């Protein structure tokens, strides 16, 4: 199985997650080609069994470069994809209140925005996940490798 992993890492967190995902999938005999979206042409993506798109969040949405990239992607309808994002972890407000997952979901729309673009092209999602970062520039939260491992386990492997 071959996975094409396209990320838009700004501060290196997404690239770190991509390397960990690639390592874990290699242990399962899966080939993962990792590249930054600046190194890829959205209308000329190499053939793969699965495309994995990864974006950091900016104001609760995928960064603009990833949104533009996804809008230009040309893949046949029915193509399988997955999403793995890097997003800010919940932090207490000035009153000390830490938002719940439900509250966070109201303003964090990275995966839904990416899905809307890709599903609008007839692509089929097979998995999605998030790795939280402690600050805007990172690093990832403690235990992030386990989150990547859990995500990798959710990818249906084809021979």
Where are these regions (language model features)?
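N-terminal beta1-alpha1 ligand-phosphate binding loop
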Residues: 2-28
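Cofactor-binding loop segments of dinucleotide-utilizing enzymes, especially the Rossmann-like FAD-
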Residues: 8-10, 37, 84-86
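FMN-binding flavodoxin-like domain, especially the glycine-rich phosphate-binding loop
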Residues: 16, 24-28, 33, 47-159
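Short acidic active-site motifs
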Residues: 39-44
């Amino acid at each position: 199985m071959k996975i094409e992993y396209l990320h838009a890492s700004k501060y290196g967190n997404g690239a770190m997650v991509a390397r960990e995902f690639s390592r874990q999938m290699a242990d399962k005999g899966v080939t993962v080609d990792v590249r930054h979206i600046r190194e890829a042409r959205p209308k000329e993506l190499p053939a793969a069994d699965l495309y994995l798109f990864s974006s950091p969040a900016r104001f609760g949405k995928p960064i603009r470069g990833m949104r533009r990239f996804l809008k230009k992607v040309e893949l046949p309808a029915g193509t399988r994809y997955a999403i793995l994002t890097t997003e800010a972890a919940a932090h207490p407000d000035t009153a000390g209140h830490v938002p719940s997952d439900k509250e966070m979901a109201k303003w964090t729309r990275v995966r839904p925005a990416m899905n809307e673009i890709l599903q609008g092209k007839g692509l089929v999602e097979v998995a999605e996940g998030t790795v939280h970062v402690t600050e805007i520039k990172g690093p990832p939260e403690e235990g992030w490798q386990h989150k990547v491992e859990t995500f990798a386990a959710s990818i249906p492997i084809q021979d």
